[in-house]
Amino acid sequence: MRTYTPKPGDINRQWHVIDATDVVLGRLASQTATLLRGKHKPTFAPHMDMGDFVIIINAEKVALTGAKLEQKRAYRHSGYPGGLSSVNYAELLEKNPVRAVEKAIKGMLPKTSLAAQQLSKLKVYRGAEHPHAAQQPKTFEITQVAQ
């Protein structure tokens, strides 16, 4: 039996909507990365972009466990000497929760050129409203462990 290689025409993309209310950020990111890569499909191929579109709503209500709100820091650099700046996740979630969710998911995608294509299928929104109702997204439930 020969190995099946999917053709670009064989890719069937679906839309999923995930409610991030009280979901631990790491669990949300890992399951979203699986959907974006397409690893949940039986026709998965690591060299192709097989993933689905993912909409995440209520990003401002995502949860972090332990003392990560105060101790975990997000870093960025301006490109100039001495241009390293950092902010803790309590401030980041208050000012820009979309960035915190995108950063966590981006870290769980492969560090290849496919990651940019897969990340472009991610839509994150601060509140409960999103403009993708025409795509008829299916609700995806995150398997949650009691905190």
UniProtKB/Swiss-Prot annotation:
Source domain of life: Bacteria
InterPro entries xrefs: Ribosomal_uL13, Ribosomal_uL13_bac-type, Ribosomal_uL13_sf
Subunit: Part of the 50S ribosomal subunit.
NCBIfam families per the UniProt record, alphabetical: rplM_bact
GO cellular component, one term: cytosolic large ribosomal subunit
Example GO molecular function: structural constituent of ribosome
One BP term from GO: translation
Organism: Renibacterium salmoninarum (strain ATCC 33209 / DSM 20767 / JCM 11484 / NBRC 15589 / NCIMB 2235)
Membership in a protein family: Belongs to the universal ribosomal protein uL13 family.
The keyword Ribonucleoprotein is assigned to this record: yes
Entry function: This protein is one of the early assembly proteins of the 50S ribosomal subunit, although it is not seen to bind rRNA by itself. It is important during the early stages of 50S assembly.
Protein name according to UniProt: Large ribosomal subunit protein uL13
Keywords: Ribonucleoprotein, Ribosomal protein
Pfam family, one: Ribosomal_L13
